[in-house]
């Protein structure tokens, strides 16, 4: 069962296998120093575009983030950089003072970082400090104003440096790790205009902080990898992660999170209702595309249009407040259903007497939520 769950975890998070003999695993301080001297990221704010995180580091970060509960946690990441890509190979949790909305690294954490780096060097691990991670329990993966300032300072004095954010609550609810990686722009830099990015749910009380600093940083593509050399460590880490997952009840452990999501949804519905009355006057009609160039007949219609007339096929979809609320409502419902189905499966698995067996129809009905 544990092996099946691990395979499911790897599929959900698209874990890729990397050859352990690849050049990236052969550390060269001279190569790192040469890249540091060239520092192409100083002239190109978008030089870094991808971060590859080892499965070992990912499970460590998720386990650490979940242990913090409603409070933020913080840790550091070690690895290398090559061809515009961060390779994160290991992480370490920091002893920090966290709250529900922020986390601060004090003198104790700084001393721990120095000692950890020294111990790594003595153990023959030459990877350098390449970033930090922290959690946003229940409010998504993005950088707040404090996070942006922290990352700006890190990039000034420790570049190349990366910021990673994990949402443990949404990870538990959805099954897939909710993670984001970011780099800040230099002060005074104006990023180029981009199209609408993928929508993510931000609580009402965080939207202002999110919007004010949204153009101060950019996201990197996150990929997860593992090698055959990681198998033993993954087995040990997975046993701890799997037991914690199996013994927990997301409906109970995420009760406060689920309640806050419903309350936030209610607030957004109230805000969206105020704009509905004026929405009909702002609808944009979608013109029908002609089937052949130069002809005035349109697809699905034999009607000939007069000169100057246009035919429309519907209304263009727009990202309205009501559309966003609908997406959030669907997500909350899906997460609740997943939690219920998970508990039903555990009940069938562990509470069925040994003298009985679970028939195929009953098992299928449980998976489909028809208990």
UniProtKB/Swiss-Prot annotation:
Record GO biological process: protein deneddylation; proteolysis; regulation of cell cycle
Listed Pfam families: CSN5_C (PF18323), JAB (PF01398)
Key word Glycosyltransferase present: no
Residue span of motif JAMM motif: 134-147
Function, as annotated: Catalytic Component of the COP9 signalosome (CSN) complex that acts as an regulator of the ubiquitin (Ubl) conjugation pathway by mediating the deneddylation of the cullin subunit of SCF-type E3 ubiquitin-protein ligase complexes.
Residues the record lists as binding Zn(2+): 134, 136, 147
Compartment list: Cytoplasm; Nucleus
Biased composition (Basic and acidic residues): 293-313
Protein name: COP9 signalosome complex subunit 5
Record InterPro entries: CSN5_C (IPR040961), JAMM/MPN+_dom (IPR000555), JAMM_MPN+_peptidase_M67A (IPR050242), MPN (IPR037518)
Entry EC no(s): 3.4.-.-
Keywords: Cytoplasm, Hydrolase, Metal-binding, Metalloprotease, Nucleus, Protease, Signalosome, Zinc
Transmembrane stretches, start-end: none
Molecular function terms, GO-annotated: deNEDDylase activity; metal ion binding; metallopeptidase activity
All copies of domain MPN, residue ranges: 51-188
Domain-related comment: The JAMM motif is essential for the protease activity of the CSN complex resulting in deneddylation of cullins. It constitutes the catalytic center of the complex.
Annotated stretches, region: Disordered: 278-333, 352-371
Subunit structure: Component of the COP9 signalosome (CSN) complex.
Gene that produces this protein: RRI1
């Amino acid at each position: 069962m544990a092996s099946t769950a691990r395979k499911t975890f790897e599929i959900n998070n698209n874990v890729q296998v990397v050859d352990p003999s690849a050049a990236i695993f052969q550390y060269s301080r001279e190569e790192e120093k040469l890249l540091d001297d060239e520092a192409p990221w100083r002239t190109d704010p978008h030089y870094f575009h991808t971060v590859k995180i080892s499965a070992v580091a990912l499970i460590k970060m998720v386990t650490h983030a979940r242990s913090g509960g409603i409070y933020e946690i913080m840790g550091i990441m070690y690895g290398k950089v090559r061809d515009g890509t961060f390779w994160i190979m290991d992480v370490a949790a920091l002893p920090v003072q966290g709250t529900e909305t922020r986390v601060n690294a004090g003198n104790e954490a700084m001393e721990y970082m120095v000692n950890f780096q020294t111990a790594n060097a003595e153990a023959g691990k030459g990877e350098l400090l390449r970033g930090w991670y922290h959690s946003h329990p229940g409010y998504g993966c993005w950088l707040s104003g404090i996070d942006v300032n922290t990352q700006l300072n890190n990039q000034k004095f420790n570049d190349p440096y990366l910021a990673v954010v994990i949402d443990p609550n949404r990870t538990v609810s959805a099954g897939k790790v909710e993670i984001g990686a970011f780099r800040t722009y230099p002060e005074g830099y104006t990023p180029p205009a981009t199209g609408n990015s993928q929508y993510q749910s931000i609580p009402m009380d965080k939207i202002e902080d999110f919007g004010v600093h949204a153009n101060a940083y950019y996201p990197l593509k996150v990929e997860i990898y593992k090698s055959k050399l990681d198998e033993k460590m993954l087995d040990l880490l997975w046993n701890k992660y799997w037991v914690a997952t199996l013994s927990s009840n997301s409906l109970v452990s995420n009760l406060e999170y689920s309640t806050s999501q419903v309350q936030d949804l209610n607030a957004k519905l109230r805000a969206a209702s105020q704009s509905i009355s004026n929405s009909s006057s702002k609808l944009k009609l979608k013109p029908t595309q002609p089937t052949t160039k130069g002809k005035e007949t349109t697809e699905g219609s034999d009607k000939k249009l007069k000169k100057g007339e246009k035919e429309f096929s519907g209304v263009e979809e727009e990202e309205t407040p009501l559309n966003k609320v609908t997406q959030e409502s669907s997500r909350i419902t899906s997460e609740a259903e997943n939690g219920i189905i998970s508990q039903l499966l555990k009940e069938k698995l562990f509470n069925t007497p040994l003298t009985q067996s679970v028939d195929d129809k009953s098992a299928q009905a449980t998976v489909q939520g028809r208990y």
